[in-house]
């Protein structure tokens, strides 16, 4: 019976390693100090569609009223977030930028297109704690691209100036993103680029400087949330290793004992020995959900209780450094009842289960995180 108890305890301890990773508190660190899991290549993609107004800042255009210089500019982009705070995007911008010749308020049309690869930096996710349901994000970006002016026309529709002008561009911008749902965001974006497309109205300067302000929607594709990589609590791992090694030594010692029994002494009044087997279920912080890697502890205890017709006492706890005493009492109650429910699932009759909860009023271990537990005691 002692060997069975030791093996049961050894199996329970061997299943607690993955639970230790869930006890760390790195979820409260800024994104720059947090590592995230690599997801599938198809995850974290997005498409943005927007429209707004644009104008050219350079040359004689500045002599014309602000409103008269505004033209309609659509944008379309496709991109991917490689981290919660870093992404890349290929955006297409173009249509018409108005230009004004020297001394004239006659509106000329510069028909152009601009494709640019942007490097996006989410300041909110970088300097703040990552939250998948955060409503507001500030995202500056910079990029390089290719610009092409098809041709220019005057107010009468006659082609003027040069055509088929190609140039490299330097692009910068700022996006303000508002979360509407898991898959849709609303964006307000301002951007500008520098390139030499020979727009009408630029005085034949060294570069054209169009600016644009747009509003639109982003559609998120695939998985949108990020999962943190939580480091292991190595102090707890070492302690569990020591306990496992100690139990292995005891099992090895028992296995070396001779099978044959010595001569029995004269019969005496038998002494009843009460065998008590404890097992533990570890929980994540602020959670009463039993992780899959902890279910084996509940299963082993249930099997032991059924085999030995033993009652089970279930006691829930919470750590004292998280939450109030009243909240921890409720949390420990939910944990204890969750374990009792799973014991019933594995075949233990409800009338053989006693449930108690201590909240954070009693701390079994000096290590704070180790007290997020339910202790199961099966006694013959």
Swiss-Prot record:
Record CDD domains: OmpA_C-like
Task: Indicate where the modification Pyrrolidone carboxylic acid is found in the sequence.
Answer: 22
Q: Which UniProt keyword terms apply here?
A: Cell outer membrane, Disulfide bond, Membrane, Pyrrolidone carboxylic acid, Signal, Transmembrane, Transmembrane beta strand
Q: Name one Pfam family in it.
A: OmpA
Single GO MF descriptor: polysaccharide binding
Ranges where the OmpA-like domain occurs:
270-380
User: Membrane topology for this entry?
Assistant: Multi-pass membrane protein
* Alphabetized InterPro entries for the sequence: Bact_OuterMem_StrucFunc (IPR050330), OmpA-like (IPR006665), OMPA-like_CS (IPR006690), OmpA-like_sf (IPR036737)
Q: Which residues form the signal peptide?
A: 1-21
Q: How does it assemble?
A: Disulfide-linked heterodimer with Omp41.
> By what name is this protein known?
Outer membrane protein 40
């Amino acid at each position: 019976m002692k060997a069975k108890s030791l093996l049961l305890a050894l199996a329970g301890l061997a299943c607690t390693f993955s639970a230790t990773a869930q006890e760390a508190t790195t979820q409260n660190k800024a994104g720059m100090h947090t590592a995230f899991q690599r997801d599938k290549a198809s995850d974290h993609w997005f498409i943005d569609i927007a429209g707004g107004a644009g104008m050219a800042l350079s040359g004689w255009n500045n002599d014309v009223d602000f409103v008269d210089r505004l033209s309609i500019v659509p944008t379309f982009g496709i991109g991917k977030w490689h981290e919660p705070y870093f992404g890349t995007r290929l955006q297409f911008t173009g249509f018409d930028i108005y230009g004004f010749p020297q001394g004239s308020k006659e509106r000329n049309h510069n028909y152009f297109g601009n494709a640019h690869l942007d490097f996006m930096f989410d300041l909110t996710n970088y300097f703040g704690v990552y939250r998948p349901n955060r409503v507001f994000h500030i995202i500056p970006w910079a990029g390089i691209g290719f610009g092409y002016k098809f041709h220019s026309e005057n107010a009468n529709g006659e082609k003027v100036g040069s055509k088929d002008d190609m140039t490299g561009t330097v692009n910068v911008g700022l996006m303000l993103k508002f979360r509407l749902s898991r898959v849709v965001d609303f964006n307000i974006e301002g951007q500008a680029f520098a390139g030499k497309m020979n727009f009408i109205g630029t005085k034949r300067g060294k570069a054209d400087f169009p600016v644009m302000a747009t509003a639109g929607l982003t559609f998120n594709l695939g998985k949108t949330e990020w999962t943190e990589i939580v480091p292991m609590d190595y102090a707890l791992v070492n302690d569990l290793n020591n306990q496992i090694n100690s139990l292995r030594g005891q099992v090895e010692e028992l296995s070396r004992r001779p099978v044959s029994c010595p001569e029995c002494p004269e019969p005496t009044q038998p002494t009843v020995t009460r065998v008590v087997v404890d097992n533990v279920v570890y929980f994540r912080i602020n959670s009463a959900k039993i992780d899959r890697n902890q279910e084996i502890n509940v299963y082993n205890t249930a099997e032991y209780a059924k085999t030995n017709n033993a009652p089970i006492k279930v006691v829930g706890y919470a750590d004292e450094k998280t939450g109030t005493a009243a909240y921890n009492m409720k949390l420990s109650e939910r944990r204890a009842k969750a374990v009792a429910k799973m014991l019933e699932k594995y075949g233990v009759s409800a009338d053989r289960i006693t449930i108690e909860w201590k909240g954070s009023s009693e701390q079994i271990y000096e290590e704070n995180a180790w007290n997020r537990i339910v202790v199961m005691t099966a006694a013959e």
